[in-house]
Amino acid sequence: MAEPELEELAELVRRLSVVHGRVTLSSGKEADYYVDLRRATLHHRASALIGRLMRELTSDWDYAVVGGLTLGADPVATAIMHAPGRPIDAFVVRKSAKTHGLQRLIEGSEVAGKRVLVVEDTSTTGNSALTAVRAVQQAGGQVLGVATVVDRATGAAEAIEAEGLPYRSVLGLADLGLG
């Protein structure tokens, strides 16, 4: 990956998103820091870097649509969609289907019959990504792999690879001075 852009993104994530202190993660585990990546994924410069670096990271996967479980994946998917390069559309997987309107679980671009990249902002256990993977597969999409901006090195890679899917991340804990 482009080293200057990777370093710039790591610095932005360190400055904007890393919060030190005891926190409970979505997995229920406790940690001494939290990576609130929405502070970076919704930042004008960091978002542009995320889009370009995620496209570069997954450039050998020929996907047509990108998305994941709301809320963390939403700005990552739109950053990829808007990054320079070939047209890629985006979708959002709801945590539960709507009970009104069209009652959809997946919003945005159709995934049925398409090659799909599932994304996350920060991966801990991989459960959020795997929830999105299953929703896409049930809707008829072909998931090519999972990519995340920050991997916490706490089991996500192993869980996703155990499902037969490749897993990649732009940044790890060492990049953020946490490893």
UniProtKB/Swiss-Prot annotation:
Coiled coil: none
Record EC number: 2.4.2.10
PANTHER family with a match to the protein in the record: OROTATE PHOSPHORIBOSYLTRANSFERASE, URIDINE 5'-MONOPHOSPHATE SYNTHASE
Record's protein name: Orotate phosphoribosyltransferase
Lineage per the UniProt record: Bacteria, Bacillati, Actinomycetota, Actinomycetes, Mycobacteriales
GO BP, sorted A to Z: 'de novo' UMP biosynthetic process; pyrimidine nucleobase biosynthetic process
Cofactor or coenzyme needed: Mg(2+)
Gene Ontology MF: a single term: orotate phosphoribosyltransferase activity
Enzyme class: transferase
The keyword Nuclease appears for this protein: no
Binding site for 5-phospho-alpha-D-ribose 1-diphosphate: 94-95, 98, 100, 120-128
Gene it is expressed from: pyrE
